[in-house]
């Protein structure tokens, strides 16, 4: 809990005032905040093997500290042998304390464990949100390399209240996300 308190405290004491000065906000309510982090795993191979979903739920629950839910297909697709409401993925939405804990773990522990890591791309969605793709779940310390059966990737989406990509980039940069082509001021 001390990490969570420190990250929230850091936002209130250092990050928010820095963003207010940088973008010349007239009100503190205009300062962008991190609303939620959504972690998603698309598991197309779950159509053939149902146990993959259970394994993925357990792994994502261990990584995030919050129960993961299976996502289901919305329609039939015969070419993929897919039926409506079949589980084809796993997701978790993190808010408040767990969100800050996961962000801390991602920045300080998981990302540095990626092989040949040179930083993450700084491409946003046009509305201040950022999605990061990770190829292997083994970068997280909660995953035991010996016990995994299949290496699975995941998408991590950072949803912010920032209206523009520039403001979203500044917020996530202040939180410590290591962007590749970071602009030095």
UniProtKB/Swiss-Prot annotation:
Alphabetized UniProt keyword annotations: Ribonucleoprotein, Ribosomal protein, RNA-binding, rRNA-binding, tRNA-binding
Annotated GO biological process: translation
Name of encoding gene: rplE
SUPFAM superfamilies membership: RL5-like
GO molecular function, one term: structural constituent of ribosome
Protein origin, superkingdom: Bacteria
A Pfam short name: Ribosomal_L5
Name assigned to this protein: Large ribosomal subunit protein uL5
Matching InterPro entries: Ribosomal_uL5 (IPR002132), Ribosomal_uL5_bac-type (IPR020930), Ribosomal_uL5_C (IPR031309), Ribosomal_uL5_dom_sf (IPR022803), Ribosomal_uL5_N (IPR031310)
Species of the source: Phocaeicola vulgatus (strain ATCC 8482 / DSM 1447 / JCM 5826 / CCUG 4940 / NBRC 14291 / NCTC 11154) (Bacteroides vulgatus)
